[in-house]
């Protein structure tokens, strides 16, 4: 396939050294999915390309590509940076994990559809100071759909009930209403408030998530349940998640 110059709208992440003065970095794009670009001379002093491809930079990038393998960056325009994600260790860790989850859900150059807007909005919210844990949990839940293992959270698995008190079953992959608690032995016996929070984060649009204040213990418990979903449904072993868990210990 012939290589061509193409302008893409995207965000930079996963930057690493390549050869003597180059870097390889991932870019999440609006229309062409996630792919790797070679940024030549990025590590040289005063490199304009290097400055425009720091992690969490976003804008328009002109790449030389044949839509497979490694593309190369030629130039850029209108590039900005989500500076708080770059400078703040906690925000950096959560944002890196969110992008890592997205990266593992898709092959390179595959259109990621609405997940581009989801991730960009999540990162913008984190950058502006909104609750990083709540936003990350929302993204985790929504990305289960990208992996093809989304649980049924909108209604009871047994009878289809949409309102009331619910529990969750990892084995069955969805919520169970209180009418069927006695008949489902595989349920997790969760606090109904935890299930309610998980349902809300999974089902509402990220635009509707305001600057909410959630009880820290409730938030911690919902995070543990979501982690169990990932452990049960997916075989992921992400360094970004390990670092995030280690960070939470301090």
Swiss-Prot record:
Keywords: DNA damage, DNA recombination, DNA repair. SUPFAM superfamilies: ArfGap/RecO-like zinc finger, Nucleic acid-binding proteins. One of its GO terms (cellular component) is bacterial nucleoid. One of its GO terms (biological process) is double-strand break repair. Pfam families: RecO_C, RecO_N. HAMAP family: RecO (MF_00201). This is DNA repair protein RecO. The gene is recO.
